[in-house]
């Protein structure tokens, strides 16, 4: 039996479940998630391997209207992910019929020369009759095959994977079978910290936050020491992140440390600092300094 492999770009509107899908397929958290849209800022690769083949998933920032330099960067990364790939997963929210946001993305991909599969997510929230109705609606509007799934519950993910493999070419194993992401540890650690800020803070605060790992080294007692700066755009945001008597930053640190220890399989001392970098999302130089490089 021939070995198949290829690169699969997962695109869609913000908060349709792209990161949840990849994490569930890989069986490990390689992409951060939160209930808020636009959590993902970089294109992240998740690697799915089985004896007969390998799929390299590329999770992308949600496609939306750009409002600042950071948004421009995120959209650039989303569109870059469509280059040199073998299959596109166009992810949509099954709670809704085909809408303007979906149409905008459809217009970007309808002319591509690679197979497109529509993954209609969140079917666990709607009854079977509506699932069938929405599936037909998306098939008629796009002309692509539509697979109803629940990324969070794992429903029909095996069907989606089989459909992807039918379109993949014969190819090499790009990554070792025990590798689940190509991202360096520092990137993943910074993202896990940022995820906790996203989940625990409110309103516009998380969108103006960046996390930069300043130091990461193993100590003599086999503990990993990590010093990270959390950058906020405003003094008021810094206060919210720190919280009353430091309660919020302690909670962010505790929850992030628990996940980082799972990732690194070692005890972690997480040293978090909150700093102000005014309007960094508006300045290209600062966007790059925060690690979002083109």
Swiss-Prot record:
Belongs to the TRAFAC class TrmE-Era-EngA-EngB-Septin-like GTPase superfamily. Era GTPase family. One of its GO terms (molecular function) is GTP binding. The keyword Cell inner membrane applies. An essential GTPase that binds both GDP and GTP, with rapid nucleotide exchange. Plays a role in 16S rRNA processing and 30S ribosomal subunit biogenesis and possibly also in cell cycle regulation and energy metabolism. Gene3D superfamilies: 3.30.300.20, P-loop containing nucleotide triphosphate hydrolases. Residues 4-170 form the Era-type G domain. It is found in: Cytoplasm; Cell inner membrane. PROSITE patterns: G_ERA (PS51713), KH_TYPE_2 (PS50823). Residues 149-151 are annotated as: G5. InterPro entries: G_ERA_dom, GTP-bd, GTPase_Era-like, KH_dom-like_a/b, KH_dom_type_2, KH_sf_prok-type, P-loop_NTPase, Small_GTP-bd. Keywords: Cell inner membrane, Cell membrane, Cytoplasm, GTP-binding, Membrane, Nucleotide-binding, Ribosome biogenesis, RNA-binding, rRNA-binding. The gene is era. Residues 59-62 are annotated as: G3. NCBIfam families: era, PRK00089.1, small_GTP. This is GTPase Era. It is a peripheral membrane protein. Residues 201-278 form the KH type-2 domain. Monomer. Residues 38-42 are annotated as: G2. GTP binds at residues 12-19, 59-63, 121-124. Residues 121-124 are annotated as: G4.
């Amino acid at each position: 039996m021939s070995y198949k492999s290829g690169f699969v770009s997962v695109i869609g509107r913000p908060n349709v479940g792209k990161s949840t899908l990849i994490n569930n397929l890989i069986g490990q958290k390689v992409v951060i998630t939160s209930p808020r849209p636009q959590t993902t800022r970089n294109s992240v690769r998740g690697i799915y391997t089985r004896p007969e083949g390998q799929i390299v998933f590329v999770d992308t920032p949600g496609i939306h209207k750009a409002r600042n330099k950071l948004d421009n960067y995120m959209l650039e990364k989303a569109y870059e992910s469509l280059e040199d790939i073998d299959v596109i997963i166009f992810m949509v929210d099954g709670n809704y019929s085909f809408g303007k946001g979906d149409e905008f993305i459809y217009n970007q991909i309808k002319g591509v020369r690679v197979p497109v599969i529509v993954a209609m997510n969140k079917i666990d929230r709607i009854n079977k009759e509506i699932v069938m109705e929405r599936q037909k609606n998306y098939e008629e509007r796009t002309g692509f095959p539509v697979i109803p799934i629940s990324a969070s519950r794992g429903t029909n993910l095996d069907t989606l994977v089989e459909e992807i493999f039918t379109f993949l070419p014969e190819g090499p194993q790009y990554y070792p079978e025990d590798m689940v992401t190509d991202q360096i540890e520092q990137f993943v650690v910074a993202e896990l910290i940022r995820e906790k800020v996203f989940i625990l803070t409110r309103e516009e605060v998380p969108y103006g936050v960046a996390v930069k790992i300043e130091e990461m080294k193993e100590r003599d007692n086999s503990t990993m020491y990590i010093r990270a700066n959390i950058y906020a755009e405003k003094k008021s945001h810094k206060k919210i992140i720190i919280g009353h008597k430091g309660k919020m930053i302690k909670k962010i640190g505790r929850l992030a440390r628990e996940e980082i220890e799972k990732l690194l399989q070692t005890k972690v001392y997480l040293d978090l600092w909150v700093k102000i970098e005014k309007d960094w999302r508006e300045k290209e130089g600062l966007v790059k300094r925060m690690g979002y490089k083109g």
